[in-house]
C-alpha cells in the first residue's frame, strides 16, 4: 500500500493541542487495523531540544534510538503502539544544518542554495523517509499558521500533494472557536481568517477541528463549512474534556476517521476502541486517592515533567487509585525546611541538571528514608538518594557529585567517560565535550538482582529502559556505600554502571538512573509507577511493611 499523509496545522493561537488531537486521530486509525506513525516538524532553529531550557520548552522526550525530541512525541507513543525514532522529529535547525553540510561537501554542484527548492526538498525527503513502510503518517507542523518560522514547512507540505499525489494527502487544520459571554455565542471569524491565511500559502484544508469550551452548534459549523470551503461533515467540534483519553471517542463519534478512510480509499474495519474505554473506566472509577509530592526545580512549568505526570496517572489507573500530584520547588525545601513535605503519601524526585535546588532534593530523599515514606528517584533523583545515603548513613560527610562540587572529598557521582551506545559503539566524553547530544542516550538493557523489589515488580531478570544522563555512580566508592546497607538492584549488562538502587531497610525506596516515564502508556502502565502508587496507597492505609 502506498503511504498516505495527513498534515496537521494549527491556527488562531498556539497551544491548541495539535499533538493531542493528531495522536487521538492516529489512535482511531490504528484501531482500524492500519499501520500508523507520526512526525513532528519544529520550526525553531535549535538542532534539537536537548539543550533548551525545560521552563521554556517543556520536557525533552527521549526515544529508544537516543534522539532528544519534542514532548509531543511522548503523546504519540502514549496514544499509538508505534515507537518513535529520530526520524519522527526534526527542526529548522536540523534541516539547515544538513543542507549546509551537503553544500560544503559539494553535493549541489555549485548551485545557489535557496529555501526553495533546497530547504523544502530536504523537508520533503525527511517526511517521506519517516513515513516509509506505514499505511498512514500524521505530520504535525509546529507553530501557528502565519508565523514566519513555519513558512518553509508549510511550503514543503503544499508541495507534497504534487510529490505523492493529492489522493494521498489530507490537510487537517486545528483552530479556535471562542465563546463570547457578552453576545452569548461562539465566534467563527478567527477560524475563517486562519483558513484564509492557509489558502494564501496554497493549502486548502480538507477538514477542520474546531476547539472550543463547548459543543459548537450545527448552524455555526455549517457557517464555517461555507466560508472555509469544506463539507459540513468535515467540520469537527472538539470541546474541552476532563481527560485527554476521551478524545479518540469524541473524534470517532463525529466520523472523522470514516471521512479520512473514504478519502484515501482505504477499506478497513470499524475502529475498536475497547482499550480506550477501559482506560476511561479505570480513570473514572478509582477506589482510593493519594497525594504524591514531586520535588523538582522546573515546577513553574508542569510540562517540564509531562511524561512523569502522565506516568503517575497511568500508575493510578493500574492500581485503581486517583493520584493528586503536588509540585514542590526543591529550593522551597531548602529555605522552608522539610515541614512542607508533611502529609504526603509518597515522594518522587525527577531528573534535572545543575546545582540550583539540589540540596532540597537531597533533603527530600533523607526525609523519605528516615520517615519510611515511599520514594521513587529518577535519574538525578537516584543520584541525590545516593549522595544522601553516603553522607548520612555511610559517614561520608562531604559526599557529592562532581557536577556540583568537582573537588569534593567523596565524589560518589562522577562524569561517565565512556560507554556503549545503542549500536554497541564506544562513546567517549570529557568535561570539555559539547553539551548537545553528548549524553548516554536511548534504550539500554539492565540486569536486575534476583532478590530485589524491582525484580518482583518487573517480573523478569533483564529490562530495557531509556537513559539521558552524563553522570553516573562512582564504582570506586561503591563498596563502602553497599557495606552501609544500600542494595544495587540493577546494573548495566557489562556490570560497569549502577542502574537501580534500593534500601532494604525501607518498605519502598527505589531509585533508577534511567527514565521509566518514557515507556509508560495509559493502556499498559509501567511496573515501577504502578508499584509506587500502590505503595503510596498502602502507606496511607498503614499497610506498607
Swiss-Prot record:
Extract the ranges annotated as region (Amidoligase domain): 1-266
Q: Where does the record place the Glutamine amidotransferase type-1 domain?
A: 291-542
| Enzymatic reactions | UTP + L-glutamine + ATP + H2O = CTP + L-glutamate + ADP + phosphate + 2 H(+); L-glutamine + H2O = L-glutamate + NH4(+); UTP + NH4(+) + ATP = CTP + ADP + phosphate + 2 H(+)
Q: Which positions in this protein are listed as binding Mg(2+)?
A: 72, 140
Which positions are annotated as binding CTP?
14, 147-149, 187-192, 223
Q: Which InterPro entries match?
A: Class_I_gatase-like, CTP_synthase, CTP_synthase_N, GATASE, GATase1_CTP_Synthase, P-loop_NTPase
Amino-acid positions noted as binding L-glutamine in the UniProt annotation, renumbered to this chain: 352, 380-383, 403, 470
Name the keywords, alphabetized: ATP-binding, Glutamine amidotransferase, Ligase, Magnesium, Metal-binding, Nucleotide-binding, Pyrimidine biosynthesis
Task: Give the Gene3D superfamilies listed for this entry.
Answer: 3.40.50.880, P-loop containing nucleotide triphosphate hydrolases
Residue positions of the active site = 379 (nucleophile), 515, 517
List the NCBIfam families hit by this protein, alphabetically.
PRK05380.1 (NF003792), PyrG (TIGR00337)
The similarity comment for this entry is: Belongs to the CTP synthase family.
Q: What does this protein do?
A: Catalyzes the ATP-dependent amination of UTP to CTP with either L-glutamine or ammonia as the source of nitrogen. Regulates intracellular CTP levels through interactions with the four ribonucleotide triphosphates.
The extra comment attached to this record reads:
CTPSs have evolved a hybrid strategy for distinguishing between UTP and CTP. The overlapping regions of the product feedback inhibitory and substrate sites recognize a common feature in both compounds, the triphosphate moiety. To differentiate isosteric substrate and product pyrimidine rings, an additional pocket far from the expected kinase/ligase catalytic site, specifically recognizes the cytosine and ribose portions of the product inhibitor.
Indicate what this protein is called per its UniProt record. Answer: CTP synthase
What species is this protein from? Proteus mirabilis (strain HI4320)
Taxonomic lineage from the root = Bacteria, Pseudomonadati, Pseudomonadota, Gammaproteobacteria, Enterobacterales
Amino acid at each position: 500500500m502506498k503511504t498516505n499523509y495527513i498534515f496537521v496545522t494549527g491556527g488562531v493561537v498556539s497551544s491548541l493541542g495539535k499533538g493531542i488531537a493528531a495522536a487521538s486521530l492516529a489512535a482511531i486509525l490504528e484501531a482500524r487495523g492500519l499501520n500508523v506513525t507520526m512526525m513532528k516538524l519544529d520550526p525553531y532553529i535549535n538542532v534539537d531540544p536537548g539543550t533548551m531550557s525545560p521552563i521554556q520548552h517543556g520536557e525533552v522526550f527521549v526515544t529508544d534510538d537516543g534522539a532528544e525530541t519534542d514532548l509531543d512525541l511522548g503523546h504519540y507513543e502514549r496514544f499509538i503502539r508505534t515507537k518513535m525514532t529520530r526520524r519522527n522529529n526534526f527542526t529548522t535547525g536540523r534541516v539547515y544544518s544538513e543542507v549546509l553540510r551537503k553544500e560544503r561537501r559539494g553535493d549541489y554542484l555549485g548551485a545557489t542554495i535557496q529555501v526553495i527548492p533546497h530547504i523544502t526538498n530536504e523537508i520533503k525527503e525527511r517526511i517521506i523517509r519517516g513515513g516509509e513502510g506505514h499505511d498512514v503518517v500524521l505530520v504535525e507542523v509546529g507553530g501557528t499558521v502565519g508565523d514566519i518560522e513555519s513558512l518553509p514547512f508549510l511550503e514543503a507540505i503544499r508541495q507534497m500533494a504534487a510529490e505523492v499525489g493529492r489522493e494521498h494527502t489530507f490537510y487537517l487544520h486545528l483552530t479556535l472557536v471562542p465563546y463570547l459571554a457578552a453576545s452569548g455565542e461562539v465566534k467563527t471569524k478567527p477560524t475563517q481568517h486562519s483558513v484564509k491565511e492557509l489558502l494564501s500559502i496554497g493549502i486548502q484544508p480538507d477538514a477542520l477541528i474546531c476547539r472550543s469550551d463547548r459543543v459548537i452548534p450545527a448552524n455555526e459549523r455549517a457557517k464555517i463549512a461555507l466560508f472555509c470551503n469544506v463539507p459540513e461533515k468535515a467540520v469537527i467540534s472538539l470541546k474541552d474534556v476532563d481527560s485527554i483519553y476521551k478524545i479518540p471517542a469524541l473524534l470517532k463519534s463525529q466520523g472523522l476517521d470514516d471521512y479520512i478512510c473514504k478519502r484515501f480509499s482505504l477499506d478497513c474495519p470499524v475502529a475498536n476502541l475497547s482499550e480506550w474505554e477501559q482506560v476511561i473506566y479505570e480513570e473514572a472509577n478509582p477506589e482510593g486517592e493519594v497525594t504524591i509530592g514531586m520535588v523538582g526545580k522546573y515546577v513553574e512549568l508542569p510540562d517540564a515533567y509531562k511524561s512523569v505526570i502522565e506516568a503517575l496517572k497511568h500508575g493510578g489507573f493500574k492500581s485503581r487509585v486517583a493520584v493528586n500530584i503536588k509540585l514542590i520547588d526543591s529550593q522551597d525545601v531548602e529555605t522552608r525546611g522539610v515541614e512542607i513535605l508533611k502529609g504526603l503519601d509518597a515522594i518522587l524526585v525527577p531528573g534535572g541538571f545543575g546545582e540550583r535546588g539540589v540540596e532540597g532534593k537531597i533533603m527530600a530523599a533523607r526525609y523519605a528514608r528516615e520517615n519510611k515514606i515511599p520514594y521513587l528517584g529518577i535519574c538525578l533523583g537516584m543520584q541525590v538518594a545516593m549522595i544522601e545515603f553516603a553522607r548520612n548513613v555511610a559517614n561520608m560527610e562531604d559526599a557529592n557529585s562532581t557536577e556540583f562540587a568537582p573537588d569534593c572529598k567523596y565524589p560518589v557521582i562522577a562524569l561517565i567517560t565512556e560507554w556503549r551506545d545503542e549500536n554497541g559503539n564506544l562513546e567517549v566524553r570529557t568535561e570539555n565535550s559539547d553539551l548537545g547530544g553528548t549524553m548516554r542516550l536511548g534504550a539500554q538493557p539492565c540486569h536486575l538482582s534476583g532478590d530485589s523489589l524491582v525484580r518482583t515488580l518487573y517480573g523478569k531478570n533483564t529490562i530495557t529502559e531509556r537513559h539521558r544522563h552524563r553522570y553516573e555512580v562512582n564504582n570506586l566508592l561503591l563498596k563502602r556505600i553497599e557495606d552501609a546497607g544500600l542494595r544495587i538492584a540493577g546494573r548495566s549488562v557489562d556490570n560497569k554502571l549502577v542502574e537501580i538502587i534500593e534500601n532494604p531497610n525501607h518498605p519502598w525506596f527505589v531509585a533508577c538512573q534511567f527514565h521509566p516515564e518514557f515507556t509508560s502508556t495509559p493502556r499498559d502502565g509501567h511496573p515501577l509507577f504502578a508499584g509506587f502508587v500502590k505503595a503510596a496507597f498502602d502507606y496511607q492505609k498503614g499497610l506498607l511493611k
